[in-house]
Amino acid sequence: METLSVWQKSDVSVRRYPRLTGDISVGALVIGGGIAGYLAAYRLAESGRKTVLIEGYRLFSGTTAGTTAKITYHQGNIYPKLAKNYGERFARMYYDSQCEGMSDILSLATEHDIDCGLKSVDSYVYSSENSEETQKLYGTMSDIGAKTALVRAETPAGSVLAVRAEGQYIFHPLRFLRSLPAHFDIYENTRALSVDTERKIVRTEEGSVHADVIVVATRYPIVDSHGAYMYKLRPSMSFTIAVEGASADATYLDIREDGLSVRPYDGGVTVGGFDRRTGTGDERAFLGLRAAAAHMFGSRPVETQWAAQDCVSFDGLPYVGRYAKGLKDIYVITGFGKWGMANSAVAARLIADLADGRDNAYEKLFSPLRGRKGVFLGTLRNVFRSAAYLISGNLHFPLKTARSVAPGEGKVVRLSGKKRAVYKESDGKLYAFDAMCPHKHAELRWNSETKTWDCPCHGSRFDRYGNLISAPALRSCESHSSLIGDGERAAGKEKKKDGSE
């Protein structure tokens, strides 16, 4: 089964960008080529700065490629949470920001006549098991002035009490972004290896960038020396399937813990859910989604399936603004918590305003320097959980060897007296590399759903061969394939039906 999203499969106008070689100086540098980084670069260039964007792999290949692409202020249960922790004023401010973000995306699509499947839909949010929670959501949204209605709705999960918001939007995110004119330079396959926060120099594999303004938009912030983001963010993975031939005329979101998200696309519907902390949980998400889709839409073919990762803050608000106290002209965008479309547009304007010294109504709302109770308690729990993963991983020493690894699977094993991660190809070929994440040395975990190695502490991910996929790690795992002995190589080979090798 393919693991490309429906957006990637239908992204036919893919343009290649060069790798940065050499040293350059610019007015603004954006690190990270997702929707947040791209829109931030767009706004910084719009304000007259010579702007460069660098992406470690391919433009829009990360979280943006795996989004369900809903442009909406109707974001699950966020408003009651904000109202409880910070009061209605903050909840209303967040609602206003999302309306502005929606308007920004719509204006850009109209201004540049972008054909990206932009479509207005109704959005239904509900708890299929707790109507009181649905009523509470409606009450909060009414109190803050959100345009919603409490209705009995026919959803894919059946007839439920739901909060309906009209005039929300869905679109093809990659077509939108690729059609948005880039008045800035783009470099792909250009991974930031270090950030000198004093001299504002970012070093890459084959060059460096000196910038007056630096924006870190890498999903997970990569400057560990400031901001304590490894404690303030939880890496979360979600799973989605595309069901061919199924239909839905709105978007649907069940806010119970294991609830699902459904939205139409050109050719069927996407069904998403089974969110979990990266590197943890059982590995039956896609099977669960297929079973749920069959229950809702009958037996229909699944076109593709994919996973996406995002960072979640502990009060539900993104971190957008100054990276840390004492750092001048260095900014961060992170923590969208799976709601990155409208938030990216808001973040782009906020960063451009801060860089140019303009006031922005949402600076305090999204400030990475905020120290509120919703942040503190979640941060404390995250510190203990991350410490537990670090300690347990370093105390664990496997007894099994490479012989125990099944074809097409990975496992942490004992190899030449050391703990190594080993992957076995379907033909029996073995690959071995360091089992500890190069970021903070937590033990990696094999994800059989995506055929990747994931870090449960901070969400670094590596492909089956140990090559880096996503930050905060900045390098791939060290290879140890040369340590695989002849006996283990022989055990790894598939035997033919006649018993020969």
Where are these regions (language model features)?
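Extreme N-terminal leader/targeting segments of oxidoreductases
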Residues: 1-28, 477-480, 493-497
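N-terminal Rossmann-like FAD-binding beta1-loop-alpha1 element of flavoenzymes
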Residues: 24-53
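Glycine-rich FAD pyrophosphate-binding loop
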Residues: 46-66
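Dinucleotide-binding Rossmann-like beta1-alpha1 core, especially the glycine-rich loop
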Residues: 74-152
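Active-site substrate-recognition segment that forms the wall
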Residues: 111-119, 208-209, 214-328, 343
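Helical element adjacent to the flavin cofactor pocket in flavoenzyme catalytic cores
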Residues: 138-140, 162-212, 217
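Rieske [2Fe-2S] iron-sulfur-binding domain
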Residues: 241, 412-497
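C-terminal catalytic lobe of FAD-dependent flavoproteins
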Residues: 256-257, 266, 286-287, 299-379, ...
